[in-house]
Amino acid sequence: MSLSLPSPSTNGSRLTPVESRHAPLFGFALLTVSCALASFALACATPFAAFAVIAAAMLPLRPALLVVTGAWLVNQGIGFGALHYPIDGNTMLWGAAIGIAALAATAAASAVLRSLPQNSTPLVLAVALICGYGVYELALLAATPVLGGADSFTAAIVAQIGVSNAAWLIGLVAACEIVRLVNPFKRGHIAS
């Protein structure tokens, strides 16, 4: 069984679960709920590269960056508020580094999605994830000389988090497709 996604809409989006006017709000809701789930389940391994690809596939770059920033803020709020991350300079700087890395991943995913052909969406989403994840991890690795933690960048750990991001991307694409199929926001749809 192959994934058959609709062709991109006139605004260039690869994922169109809702009309383009609802896309920023839907993207924000999808990623903040997903981020809350991931933050409690995975703590520091929140799949921001997958979030970046979903946002970039649904939205132009600026709204995608805003949506990913919102997801990052949710992650930080849960981390410091509910999970009781230590409130110290190093932890806060790592939080900022994660936010910067997530935004860099979003920009990279957006560039990939804009530059590759509009057909073959599943393959292009995979390429966008690989590029976005690479940028995300490199941005975090660049912070290690100042913040420490280089021992967390072993091949096994990076691969495990990469697989987690791939699984989250598949799940988020599936959620988008389900919403597209049962979209309550379609024109002419009357709520019962």
Model-identified regions with their sequence ranges:
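Membrane-helix boundary/juxtamembrane interface motif
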Residues: 11, 30-31, 76, 83, ...
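Alpha-helical membrane segments and adjacent membrane-interface helices in multi-pass membrane proteins
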Residues: 39-105
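Aromatic-anchored segments of alpha-helical transmembrane domains
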Residues: 31-40, 70-83, 130-142
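Hydrophobic alpha-helical transmembrane segments
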Residues: 25-29, 65-69, 95-100, 126-130, ...
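Membrane-embedded alpha-helical hairpins and interfacial helices in multi-pass inner-membrane proteins
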Residues: 111-192
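Membrane-helix interfacial "entry" motifs
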Residues: 16, 20, 49, 53, ...
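Hydrophobic transmembrane alpha-helices
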Residues: 2-59, 63-66
